[in-house]
Amino acid sequence: MSGGLNMVYMLLGTGFEETEAVAPIDLLRRAGVSVAAVGIGGKVIVGSHGIPVTADMELGQMDLTQLDMIVLPGGVKGVASI
């Protein structure tokens, strides 16, 4: 845990911008922050450039009692699907 953060959830919807999701997840985890990629509509989500990403969990599995931050990556279709 870093900076008092318990959990950060990165919401991934079909068409999300891959670099806007994967790079922040990587950097936050390197800093010791707990980050989970959350798939909207399944665990395997396809980004805006056709790259499939396997989420850590699906939307219904989020523990909101531990939530500190939700991150929404860009991508027109990804944002619309969230």
Model-derived segments and their meaning:
Residues M1-I82:
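Extended, subdomain-level signal for the structured scaffold at the beginning of enzyme domains
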